[in-house]
Amino acid sequence: MQRPKALITGASAGIGKTYARKLAGRYDLVLVARDAARLETLAAELKAAGASSEIIAADLTKSEKVAAVERKLESDPAISFFLNNAGIATVEKSLQTSIATIERLVALNVVAATRLCLAAGRAFTARKSGTIVNMASAVAVNPERFNAIYGGSKAFLLALSQGLTRELTENGVIIQTVLPGATRTEIWERAGTDISRLPPERVMEVEELVDAALKGLELGERITIPSLPDYQDILDAEAARLKLSPNLSRNHPAARYR
């Protein structure tokens, strides 16, 4: 009997690689990242753990590479878990961020993430089951703390997840958004900073992060902030957001504007 498959973007290192290791006991893997050699090494490791892996070497800032992953998501009925994890960050001052960096960041964190989320959503809706995990960031709800462009891209992914929740849920699809804080991965080095400059009590190890995110999924959380002590804070924030809903569109301005 064929095992279900999990497709993971950004699978060659950090969060994606750790998810692959954690899921290998239950899923075969489709591993997506730019670095084919790293993916081959990971696939060999996972094979020893009993999981077969398919490799898709792809730079997801390129539209044609995103299209290849879209086709895989929509054509392989064994795929039932999608980790939307590929992303880049920048620590430059927002106003000094280069056009090249902006375009690459938006292409990966927004355009590719959206296209793949929707492809998975279409595929899983047709099959009436499946799980999408969108890897956002804590700066999605606290954008003042980091580069505004990066924070904006992660806020977009959170909003996309929230907007899709009802449509997906009624078709048997689970969508979870994970909002990590600072996590010890290569994204910091690639962004041009040293994570050791951050207070150690602010930095989570990647294995702990992934364990918490998977536990949150098991608990039925649709938004998971691994470092947040009280989940009621998320529920309260969501309730406050939804409280605005009845008055967001009216035929006249509020009384204070008259």
Could you say what each language-model-derived stretch is?
Residues K93-R104:
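Substrate-binding pocket helix/loop in short-chain dehydrogenase/reductase
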Residues S137:
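Residue(s) in the substrate-gating loop at a strand-loop-helix junction
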